[in-house]
Amino acid sequence: MTKKIDSKELPPFEYPQGYQLFAGVDEVGRGPLVGAVVTAAVILDPNNPIEGLTDSKKLTEKKRDLLFPEIQEKALAWSLGRCEAHEIDELNILQATMVAMQRAIAGLKVTPDFALIDGNKVPELPMAGLAVVKGDLRVQEISAASILAKVTRDREMEVLDKEFPQYGFAKHKGYPTKAHFAAIEEHGVISEHRRSFKPVKRVLGIE
């Protein structure tokens, strides 16, 4: 059984010395069978702090929705990036995530000196970068990015749900749940489904 890591057990993050502007970068949507992988990059303003930043998955939907506009308003810069389902199929999910992160950073109106990436892999960037394991719990910039990315993708799934209510996207957000599998088996796949993912391949008979 995997032990859940409490943020209090994690070592405090030490920011690399000699840099001024840090961008936090995170992604949402690597696991779902449908839709884009969405990324965000955020440079926070030390003179305009935001209370309550943490991993977006640890916050209620209501709290995320409250923080979403506050981050956009108070950050020095923020940007969203994405790779669509067809790009994920062409590249693979890891490479597509790296590209989406590159797009988020490239979209920042202020150029950061250093990029802090949640996870264990840094995409090729024009500035220094560091992968931070559990960064969404340890680094406020990454926490802010995780909230922007999650709220954005969740809202996209709610829009898709209105177009295709039979799939239940608003509930499971495209993740591989029993309800999602059952809907695919009954109704087939839509253009937003990731055809390179095994459960989708199975329904299409292209395993």
From Swiss-Prot:
Major localization class: cytoplasm
GO cellular component annotations of the record: cytoplasm; ribonuclease H2 complex
Binding residues for a divalent metal cation: 26-27, 118
Coiled-coil annotated residue ranges, if any: none
Cofactor(s) needed for function: Mn(2+); Mg(2+)
Keyword line: Cytoplasm, Endonuclease, Hydrolase, Manganese, Metal-binding, Nuclease
Domain of life: Bacteria
E.C. numbers: 3.1.26.4
Domain RNase H type-2: 20-207
Function: Endonuclease that specifically degrades the RNA of RNA-DNA hybrids.
Protein name: Ribonuclease HII
Organism classification: Bacteria, Pseudomonadati, Pseudomonadota, Gammaproteobacteria, Vibrionales
Protein encoded by which gene: rnhB
